[in-house]
Each structure stands twice: as C-alpha cells, then as structure tokens.
Amino acid sequence: MIYSIIICAGALLGFLILQKLLAPKDTRPPLPPGPWRKPIIGNLTDFPPKGTPEWLFWAKHHERYGPMSSLEVMGQTIIMINDAHLGIEIMHKKSALSQMIPDAPFAHMAGWGMSLATERNKQAWKTIRANMKQEIGTRRAIATFHPKMEIGIRRFLLRTLDNPDDLRFHIRKEANAFMMDVAYGYTIAPHGKDELYDLTQQSVRQFSHIFSPGEWSVNFFPILRYVPSWFPGASFQIKAAEYKRTIERMTMVPYLWIKDQVARGCTRPSILLRLLQKGHYESGSHQEQVLVWTNAEFVMGGSDTTVSAVSSFFVAMALYPEVQHQAREELDRVVGPTTLATFEHRSQLPFIDALVKEVFRWHPASPLGAPHITQEDQIWDGYLLPKGALLLPNIWTFTHDPSVYHDPMVFKPERFLERQSSPPETDPMKFVFGFGRRICPGRFVTDEKLFLIACHAISCFLISPKDPGAPEPDWLPGVISQPGPFDLNVVPRSPAHEELIRSIETDHPWKNADATDISQFMARNQMI
C-alpha cells in the first residue's frame, strides 16, 4: 500500500501546489475543527488503527473538537457528526440536502456495485428500495411473515435448549433461516453442511470488511484500481477478486435455482419468485442484476442486524437480572407463565416494548451510520459543510449522549416508559437505522423479531453469565458490530417450560431441507 501512496502522492503534488497558488481566496466560513492536516495526504493517517472500535475512536473527536469535526484526505472533506441533536437536524430534517451515495471504488471492484450502499444509478437504487419497501418496508407487510417468524423462533428455542453453549451459532442460523425462506423459499439444513447458508455467511463477513472506513487505499486514490495485482502494495486487487467471486455466487445461485424450479414446475412462494413473475429479465441484463440484488440486500442486511441485536439482548439480560425479572413478571401477568406471547400482545407489554428500544440504544447494530454526501454548501453553527463532503454520523455517540439519555451507559428500559415525573426519552428508532431515503428498509424485520425472541426467551429461559463477576464484554469493530465473547448460562425455567419448548417438534416438524438439492444444482452448474 505504501508504494501506491508514494506514486500517487508524487503525481498529485504538483497539481495540488498549483491549485493552491491559483485558487481565489476563500471567504466562506471555516470547516469544523479537526486534527492537523499533513501535506499532500491530509488526515490519511488519522483513521482508527486496525482492530479498534471505530465509534469509540471517533467519539474522542467529540471530546476534543465538539459536536462536529472534520478531516481531509486528498481533497475529500469528511465531517464526523457526534451529536444527536445536530445529527437529527442535518441528516433527518434536512436529509434532502445530503442524499447522495459516496463513491466506493473498492466495493465496485469487489462486485458490490449494485448494493444499496454503493449503487449510484438513481433508477436502479429506487427500484431496489421500492421492491424492498413493498415486501418488508412496513409493519403491515411484515405481518404476512409473522407465522414464519413464530415457527423459526420456536425452533431457535429448541436448538438453544439442546446446545446452549452454541447460542451465537443458533442466533445466526435462525436469522438466516427466516430471511432465506422468505426471500427464496429455501429451507436450510437443521444440521450439517449447507452450501447456500455458508455462502451467505461468507458474504456478510466480507461486507463488513469491504465497507470498513479507511480500510482500502484505492478509496482515497481511485487511480490505484488500474494498478496490477503483482505491483507492490496492490494486494487489494487480489482481495477484490476473491470477494467478487463470493458475491457473484451468493446473488446468482438462488436466482438461477429458482429459475430452474420454474422450468421444472416445482416452485414455492418467495419474494424472488413474485418479482420474477412480474416481468421479463434478459440474462445478464441490468434489470436482472437489480432483481437479484433486491433479494441479496434483504437476506444479508436483515440477517446481520438481527444477529447483532439479538446477541446484545442476551448479554443485557445476563448483566441486568433485575430487568430480566421485571420483563418476565410482565409476561407472566399478561400472557401467562406457560404461554408464549404473540405479536398481538405487544400493545399490552409496554416494558418489553421499552426493552427492545433499549437494546437498540444500548449498542446500535451499526454504530457508525451510513455515510451521506452533501449536495450543496451548508452552514451549521458557523461552520461550513461544503458540497461533496462526506457526512459520517456516529450513531453510538447519539445513543450515549447524556444530554439525550440519562445514565447512557446503563441498560434501563424504563427510560422509554410514560411516567408522571418525566416524559419518555427519545426513541432510538429515529436514528439507529439511518436517515431519510437511506434509512434501513428492513428495520421492521429486526424490530419485530427482537420483540418476539425477547418474549419467548425471557418466558422460557433463565439467562445469566457463567462467570457471575464477568464485566460487560467488548463490542467488536465493523460495519455491523456484535458483542465479543461472553459465556452465558441459558437454562429452562422449569420442566413445564422445557416441555413447552419441545412442543415445536410435534407442532411444526422440520420440512425437508434444500441443502442437498442446492449442492447438486451448484455442482451441475459448476458453481461450487
């Protein structure tokens, strides 16, 4: 990487000096404060070190520079927003002024050019979002999937009962099983190898690496995309090719599998099938790519945020037993001690509803929000946000701002309840899933699944840390963050609750899985 930077820096040095000499004097307000810009490279070395939680690194800017800070890398201005009030004003109320998607050369090289995070073709972007909004973008749309959610969550309880030490694996499996069933009509293997499930997991892991801020030199020096992979410092070319192979298989395998089912006359309901039947898609066309990426976004985006939220929920219940007890008391009183809640109970369970909000606030799934680009010069608090600046909202600082949330480091669901002494605190749903037209279209999936998992897990299990004195775990860095290792005891409340969990085996026995069929299909078409 250093060789590539030196080459580009030398080529740009003369241009930047000339530009500085010839540029007219700028009479606009100053940029927000920030670290000193080094010659040529600016703040290229001021990004978080590898392995550092990005949101905590940027939160230090709040302490040093105030609610907004700025950096500059090779002429690209970056504005960090670390204040909840300011973030809502700039990115929500004035969202029309910063809706553009930032360019991400490495993501395009890695095959993610059609992702909602990078797609700059307005029509394609609108089509993907419109498809997702129609299928999962409202609570009314999500209600059609409630039966699938309920069955999947009960199976999750059973797997957790049988193998509680593999809780994180069960959380991931349940999240992906639901998404793949709804998107593709695909039934994952309850045990053993599943090629499509593994491919989805690999794509999700690579997503976090691809979109990690400051990770790839080519994002700062786009000309590097033309450097051959054998050139010193160009190992990103090899990674891009590897990631591209993965995402091409992940997007195309289920699509071609469903087309094969259509040809054989053995289809089953799915989002992809419904969209496929609405139009004609030429092989290799842009319209076909829009179609397959609609479903890829649904499967990967919804599953990863759900995994993060549910993992954080279990950690919170172990660390705050008094909250777990209060939630269980409400469930026993409203629903019954040996009855599982349904979505219809939510309006009668205010503490559980508040608990779900507190999970989202306590540790947002995406602690750094999706970046936006300003479409015109803006002035805020006497500082300039120039046209073309990259806006990065630090969602974690929004949800841990003591001027917005009392005792922000403490898990307190009651902060969202109606009380005579004080009004409820700000609903974190206002910002934890993004802003404006770039808000996460799958947010209601994560919200409703977390609600039902919380209800069922608290009703059926006693959750505690294996080490009673264990501190709160560290949260792992990444675009989607999850709690680090934290061993839990998850045991049934009573024999009656164990029997309730096991009733899923007779109420809804496993259907035949599609793992063998998809493996054979991939082998026939040389996709493995």
From Swiss-Prot:
Gene3D superfamilies: Cytochrome P450. Pathway: Mycotoxin biosynthesis; aflatoxin biosynthesis. GO terms for molecular function: aflatoxin B synthase activity; heme binding; iron ion binding; monooxygenase activity. Its EC number is 1.14.14.117. Belongs to the cytochrome P450 family. InterPro entries: Cyt_P450, Cyt_P450_CS, Cyt_P450_E_grp-I, Cyt_P450_sf, Cytochrome_P450_fung. Residues 1-23 form the signal peptide. The gene is aflQ. Its cofactor is heme. This is O-methylsterigmatocystin oxidoreductase. Glycans are attached at residue 43. The keyword Chaperone does not apply. Keywords: Glycoprotein, Heme, Iron, Metal-binding, Monooxygenase, Oxidoreductase, Signal. O-methylsterigmatocystin oxidoreductase; part of the gene cluster that mediates the biosynthesis of aflatoxins, a group of polyketide-derived furanocoumarins, and part of the most toxic and carcinogenic compounds among the known mycotoxins. The four major aflatoxins produced by A.parasiticus are aflatoxin B1 (AFB1), aflatoxin B2 (AFB2), aflatoxin G1 (AFG1) and aflatoxin G2 (AFG2). Within the aflatoxin pathway, the O-methylsterigmatocystin oxidoreductase aflQ is involved in the last steps in which OMST is converted to aflatoxins B1 and G1, and DHOMST to aflatoxins B2 and G2. One of its GO terms (biological process) is aflatoxin biosynthetic process. Heme binds at residue 440. It catalyses: 8-O-methylsterigmatocystin + 2 reduced [NADPH--hemoprotein reductase] + 2 O2 = aflatoxin B1 + methanol + 2 oxidized [NADPH--hemoprotein reductase] + CO2 + H2O + 2 H(+); 8-O-methyldihydrosterigmatocystin + 2 reduced [NADPH--hemoprotein reductase] + 2 O2 = aflatoxin B2 + methanol + 2 oxidized [NADPH--hemoprotein reductase] + CO2 + H2O + 2 H(+).
